[in-house]
Amino acid sequence: MNPLPTIKKKLKLLLNRFSVSYVKIDLMSVTQNELLKGRYAIITGGTSGIGYAIAEAFVKSGCNVIITGRSKGRLDNAVSKLSRYNTKTVGFVLDNTNVASFGLVFTQMQDAVNGQPIDILVNNAGVNFKGMPYTTEEEYDSVLDTNLKGTFFLSQVFGKYMVDNGIKGNILNVASASSLRPANSAYTLSKWGIRGLTLGLAKALAKDGITVNGIAPGPTATPMLMKDNQNDNMVLERLPLGRYIMPEKVANMAVILVSSMGRAIMGDIIYMTGGAGILTYDDVPYSF
């Protein structure tokens, strides 16, 4: 049974809540191929949104995946759906703010794939809260710890593992088109940090044959963004694309970036903004 008609219908109903008169939904995604055949990838925040879409695109491309998330129930559900493809899929509960746990969890991940070399890390886990002037210190710490600090230290663990074992793999960081704008929220500030971290990792690891890049989506139809904008359709009205970007589109690019097709792309941030990058200060309000 083809699930696309049902998915499209639900998405249209969801988007209609934002008073949009017409949105064309295109869910074209990577078809089954062998671009990543036999490889092993860790994808943080892989239970929904962009993370899940990347995991699905990877398994369609022959990759074995380890997805992480904070909820065991959501992990089990995602693993169950991904397991219909002929690859290995494993889920691990991981809190991106608990840096002290990274070493042990990574060892357990290696055991789960019987010591096969893990050669792809996708840093996708992220959270968001309201921006200035309503951000609390607790929210600020949560965003920076999850989005930036966690990515930094997980990349450190994974990078050392690849260097020590002579693995010529990939690190792909999910940044954001918001990092093109002045930061007035902890989320945007964290994504500015991801930009810098991506460049630094790329420079440090290139000599070891490890390719590091970033992918920076614009407003994407993920549970996090749709929830945050449930009473505000500004994104759809102002974005030149005219609608939210679909996670599957971001996932398609992720496959290219970690495959041999993307080998010449190194230390780059690929922006998939839906036109957000050409908006002016007048298009995006800044105020308290």
Regions found by a protein language model. Give the residues of each.
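Short C-terminal tail/terminal secondary-structure segment
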Residues: L27-T31, M266-F288
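Active-site helix of classical SDR
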Residues: S155, S190, T198
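Short, small/polar-rich loop/turn modules that mediate ligand/substrate recognition or access, typified
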Residues: A206, T211, I265-G267
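C-terminal substrate-recognition "lid" of short-chain dehydrogenase/reductases
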Residues: R243-M272, G277-I278
